[in-house]
């Protein structure tokens, strides 16, 4: 499982021109799920997402997590994170989990985040989406298990 976290000032995700999820301050989580991933992987990464201290405290140090900062998490599935570009010029997506299994683990990740009290608006799984965000910092972190 690979997650790209981007600290954002505000972000939204749209499908067919309609906003389906948006946040103000918080994290945008782009989530790629592979064949070997399990509920335990999704739970561990949800815990890491919620607890990662990448928001500044009053002294300007990254000491606060998204919960402490009063932020939300915008969760967006993105199988292209599992692209294999080692051969040729066309990415291969054979490392990505099948859609049914990927959706189960995506929903598990979101559910685990929500158990922490976070608001977690989402994109629509497997839809073509337009993501808009203002990256804050910029701070972009890649989580992988």
Swiss-Prot record:
Gene (name only): dtd
Family: Belongs to the DTD family.
EC number(s) reported in the record: 3.1.1.96
InterPro entries associated with the record: Daa-tRNA_deacyls_DTD, DTD-like_sf
Domains: entry comment: A Gly-cisPro motif from one monomer fits into the active site of the other monomer to allow specific chiral rejection of L-amino acids.
Subcellular localization: Cytoplasm
Entry's Gene Ontology molecular function annotations: D-tyrosyl-tRNA(Tyr) deacylase activity; Gly-tRNA(Ala) deacylase activity; Ser(Gly)-tRNA(Ala) hydrolase activity; tRNA binding
Free-text function comment from the UniProt entry: An aminoacyl-tRNA editing enzyme that deacylates mischarged D-aminoacyl-tRNAs. Also deacylates mischarged glycyl-tRNA(Ala), protecting cells against glycine mischarging by AlaRS. Acts via tRNA-based rather than protein-based catalysis; rejects L-amino acids rather than detecting D-amino acids in the active site. By recycling D-aminoacyl-tRNA to D-amino acids and free tRNA molecules, this enzyme counteracts the toxicity associated with the formation of D-aminoacyl-tRNA entities in vivo and helps enforce protein L-homochirality.
Subunit description: Homodimer.
Keyword Zinc: no
Entry keywords, A to Z: Cytoplasm, Hydrolase, RNA-binding, tRNA-binding
Gene Ontology CC entries for this record: cytoplasm
Protein name: D-aminoacyl-tRNA deacylase
Domain of life: Bacteria
GO biological process assignments: D-amino acid catabolic process; tRNA metabolic process
Motif (Gly-cisPro motif, important for rejection of L-amino acids): 137-138
Catalysed transformations (reactions): glycyl-tRNA(Ala) + H2O = tRNA(Ala) + glycine + H(+); a D-aminoacyl-tRNA + H2O = a tRNA + a D-alpha-amino acid + H(+)
């Amino acid at each position: 499982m690979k997650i790209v976290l981007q600290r954002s000032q505000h972000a939204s995700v749209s499908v067919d021109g309609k906003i389906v999820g948006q946040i103000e301050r918080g994290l945008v989580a782009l989530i790629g799920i592979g064949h070997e991933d399990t509920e335990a992987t999704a739970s561990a990464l949800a815990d890491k997402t919620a607890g990662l201290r990448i928001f500044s405290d009053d002294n300007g140090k990254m000491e606060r997590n998204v919960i402490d900062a009063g932020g939300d998490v915008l969760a967006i599935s993105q199988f292209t994170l599992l692209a294999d570009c080692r051969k040729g010029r066309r990415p291969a997506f054979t490392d990505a989990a099948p859609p049914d299994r990927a959706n189960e683990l995506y929903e598990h990740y979101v559910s685990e985040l929500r158990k922490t009290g976070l608001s977690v608006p989402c994109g629509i799984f497997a839809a073509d989406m337009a993501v808009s965000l203002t990256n804050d910092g910029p701070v972009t972190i890649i989580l992988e298990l």
